[in-house]
């Protein structure tokens, strides 16, 4: 029976980039990694209503740069930049180095897998029917230009005694094609019946072209033809 790999890890260095960009010695690696996890957990709680999609952490020499991708940058910044200053102070305490925070706006939040997953989780916590929440998110994504979307939820759905999983898919979501631009995210909904898990796959904009120059691939093909002819 085939098992599904994490689509983001599967496509690293092909179509996806790392969310943490730094190098550490083996003696410091676990400490730095734990800091990254703490920072992401803090931002997830602090910015729960800011529609945060991706958080990129970079570590230049003895400092840190955090880029927050949000559909609602005004909520992150706050009035006259007050909230972002508080955020920066808290992050400096967590990381122990000077922190620079950048905010980037997500233009189409309906196509961001993390925002979709968090949005469904918030609806489930407000006792919205899980099928209705899932199908509404799928319709919004397809209307916004997605080629395909798949949403899966697991747990005690609608308060059932036995936990189960249900998933819905619209369009196509290629899992084996490395060049396919598949965005993947997970989230959790904490309900009175327990924790529900959510997984979202969003396929957009078709296949991504290879990063290799076109003339290079043509030269290789010509070389293979000459070798075969000889």
Swiss-Prot record:
GO terms for molecular function: mRNA binding; rRNA binding; structural constituent of ribosome. One of its GO terms (biological process) is translation. InterPro entries: KH_dom, KH_dom-like_a/b, KH_dom_type_2, KH_sf_prok-type, Ribosomal_S3_C_sf, Ribosomal_uS3_bac-typ, Ribosomal_uS3_C, Ribosomal_uS3_CS. One of its GO terms (cellular component) is cytosolic small ribosomal subunit. Keywords: Ribonucleoprotein, Ribosomal protein, RNA-binding, rRNA-binding. Belongs to the universal ribosomal protein uS3 family. This is Small ribosomal subunit protein uS3.
């Amino acid at each position: 029976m085939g098992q599904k790999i994490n689509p983001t890890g599967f496509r690293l260095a092909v179509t996806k980039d790392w969310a943490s960009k730094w190098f550490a010695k083996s003696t410091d690696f676990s400490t730095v990694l734990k800091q990254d996890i703490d920072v992401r957990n803090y931002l997830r709680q602090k910015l729960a209503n800011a529609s945060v999609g991706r958080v990129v952490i970079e570590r230049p020499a003895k400092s840190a740069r955090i880029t927050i991708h949000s559909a609602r940058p005004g909520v992150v910044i706050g009035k006259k930049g007050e909230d972002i200053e508080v955020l920066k102070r808290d992050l400096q305490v967590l990381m122990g180095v000077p922190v620079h925070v950048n905010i980037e706006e997500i233009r189409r939040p309906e196509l961001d897998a993390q925002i979709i997953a968090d949005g469904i989780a918030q609806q489930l916590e407000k006792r919205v029917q899980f099928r209705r929440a899932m199908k509404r998110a799928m319709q919004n994504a397809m209307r916004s230009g997605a080629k395909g979307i798949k949403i899966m939820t697991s747990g005690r759905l609608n308060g059932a005694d036995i936990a189960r999983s249900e998933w819905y898919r619209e369009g196509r979501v290629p899992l084996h094609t490395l060049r396919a631009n598949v965005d993947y995210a997970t989230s959790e909904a904490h309900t009175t019946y327990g924790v529900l898990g959510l997984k979202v796959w969003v396929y957009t904009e078709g296949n991504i072209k290879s990063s290799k120059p076109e003339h290079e691939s043509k030269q290789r093909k010509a070389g293979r033809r000459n070798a075969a002819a000889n």
